[in-house]
């Protein structure tokens, strides 16, 4: 397969279906997006590295200045980035920088918890570039968690979320490391995006009650992530219990219980899984 140098990776826009989860999980994910995440910062840094739009393509000074102002806000308040990004898109609707602007807006709306606008920004990002693994991997994870099961056209939206994940997994191995990029950081970034894709697939499998498949996907998610998501450990433990892998469930719940807003719930579930391991026939 021919390696690709991804300049403006993109995503496939769509929605997903959330399985019935406890309030604790939704509280946990909202806690994670309430402040800027490592993924969010990485996306802004990627945008900064792509400031050069290529030889022979002219940009006026006002446009370039507005884009630089957006990138300068990359480590600050996401609400500020949103204002700068929306202003840029309104003022320069045909800008060559728009793929990056909509990528920044997608991640910024994610950390602000604005699901609808996150989807809208992502839709525009994919229209401008179909291989944006930054945005695609983010939505592959977020969509199945953030859209309720009562959403209209739920089955279709679930399929779309699944497509994001598979496309991410397909593209990332073909990416060529930029010449000045650190090898370890490049691998870390790729693995973190793959982890998001596998997390999304695991959640989708949970919704379909395919618990063995969910175990496979969620195990990959926690193994690939540089900082595994406690929600993935929670879901993995739940899939383990459903498949009668009680000892594995104990291990997953104990990882989930190490920290975060799900800690108390995971401790209780770990104790329950221990009881199941002693009293039931497991695998």
What are the functions of these language-model segments?
Residues 178-180, 191-207, 242-283:
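Terminal, low-structured helical/coil segments at or just beyond the last alpha-helical repeat
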Residues 107, 141, 145-148, 203, ...:
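Residue-level recognition of tetratricopeptide repeat
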Residues 25-100, 283:
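N-terminal leader/linker segments that initiate helical-solenoid repeat arrays
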Residues 91-98, 128-133, 173-184, 188-192, ...:
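Short solvent-exposed coil/turn linkers within tandem alpha-helical repeat scaffolds
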Residues 68-69, 105, 139, 194, ...:
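Structural register within alpha-helical repeat arrays
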């Amino acid at each position: 397969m021919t390696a690709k140098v991804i300049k403006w990776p993109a995503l496939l826009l769509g929605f997903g279906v959330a399985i019935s989860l406890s309030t604790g999980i939704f509280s946990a994910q909202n806690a994670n997006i309430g402040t800027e995440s490592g993924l969010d910062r990485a996306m802004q840094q990627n945008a900064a590295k792509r400031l050069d739009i290529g030889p022979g393509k002219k940009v006026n000074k006002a446009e370039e200045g507005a884009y630089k102002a957006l990138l300068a806000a990359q480590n600050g308040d996401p609400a500020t980035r949103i204002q700068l990004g929306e202003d840029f898109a309104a003022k320069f609707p045909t800008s060559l920088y728009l793929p990056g602007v909509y990528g920044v807006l997608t991640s910024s709306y994610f950390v602000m918890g604005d699901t609808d606008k996150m989807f809208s920004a992502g839709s525009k990002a994919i229209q401008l570039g179909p291989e944006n693994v930054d945005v695609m991997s983010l939505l592959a994870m977020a969509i199945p968690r953030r859209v309720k099961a009562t959403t209209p056209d739920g089955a279709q939206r679930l399929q779309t979320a699944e497509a994001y994940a598979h496309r991410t997994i397909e593209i990332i191995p073909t990416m060529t490391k930029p010449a000045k990029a650190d090898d370890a950081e490049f691998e870390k970034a790729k693995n973190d995006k793959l982890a998001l894709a596998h997390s999304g697939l695991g959640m989708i499998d949970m919704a379909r009650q395919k618990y063995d498949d969910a175990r496979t996907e969620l195990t990959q998610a926690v193994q690939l992530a540089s900082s595994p998501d406690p929600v993935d450990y929670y879901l993995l433990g739940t899939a383990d219990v459903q498949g009668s892998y009680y000892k594995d469930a104990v291990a997953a719940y104990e990882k989930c219980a190490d920290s975060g807003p799900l800690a108390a719930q995971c401790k209780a579930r770990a104790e329950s899984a221990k009881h199941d391991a002693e009293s039931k026939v497991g695998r």
